[in-house]
């Protein structure tokens, strides 16, 4: 399902000149968006995915299979910036050293990293991996799709995903109009896009978000507390 927003965001970036040939793409992902970028193989994208070591091994294998280079972090990807799960400075410094080492192994200039180490450690201290990806893109000249903030993410699910589901139901003599839709919340793109489609086409509010319990760690899925202000 992530191929839809990935294609939409990358297409827009190419058309607008925000993504140039040979430019590295970096994004924070629970795995699926990174895999989706890898599936756009004809574009020959050079992609680095910031991922959590908490992911299942199968996800890492899939990322490798589509030639995505990963930077593994000992923290969640989806917690809302600056909310729960703050780390102390020593842990942040250790995480920064880990990222620096991985950037070096990937062939990038660590002097650039060193000059921005205080900002990077601050982002790591608050587990703000989403904005860390943006910051690394800024200092290294990478392109960050910013899937968590992009209206193009929601638009892709509104114009493509929802329309596909509705079309498949129409082929069976049915329609989305008569259904309630239940989904989880990671970037908010799927739930947001489906909700807008239902509202615009059928004048209904029939999309419901299911959150895991607060103490349950599900890679890429927000708890209700970590989605406050985003839903």
Please report, for each region that a protein language model flagged, where it lies by residue.
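PLP-dependent amino-acid enzyme catalytic core
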Residues: 1-231
């Amino acid at each position: 399902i992530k191929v839809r927003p990935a294609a939409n965001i990358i297409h827009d970036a190419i058309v607008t000149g925000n993504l140039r040939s040979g430019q590295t793409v970096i994004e924070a992902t629970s795995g699926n968006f990174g895999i989706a970028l890898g599936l756009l193989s004809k574009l020959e994208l050079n992609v680095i995915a910031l991922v959590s070591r908490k992911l299942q091994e199968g996800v890492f294998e899939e990322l490798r299979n589509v030639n995505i280079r990963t930077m593994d972090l000992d923290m969640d990807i989806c917690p809302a910036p600056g909310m729960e799960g703050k780390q102390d400075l020593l842990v942040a410094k250790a995480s920064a050293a880990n990222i620096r080492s991985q950037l070096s192994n990937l062939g990038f200039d660590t002097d650039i990293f060193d000059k921005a180490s205080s900002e990077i450690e601050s982002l790591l201290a608050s587990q703000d991996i989403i904005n860390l990806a943006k910051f690394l893109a800024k200092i290294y000249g990478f392109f960050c799709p910013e899937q968590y903030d992009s209206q193009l993410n929601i638009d892709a699910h509104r114009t493509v995903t929802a329309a596909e589901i509705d079309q498949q139901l129409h082929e069976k003599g049915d329609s989305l109009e008569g259904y309630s839709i239940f989904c989880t919340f990671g970037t908010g793109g799927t739930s947001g896009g489906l909700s807008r489609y239902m509202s615009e086409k059928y004048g209904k509010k029939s999309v419901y978000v299911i959150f895991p319990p607060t103490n349950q760690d599900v890679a890429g899925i927000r708890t209700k507390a970590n989605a406050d202000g985003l839903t």
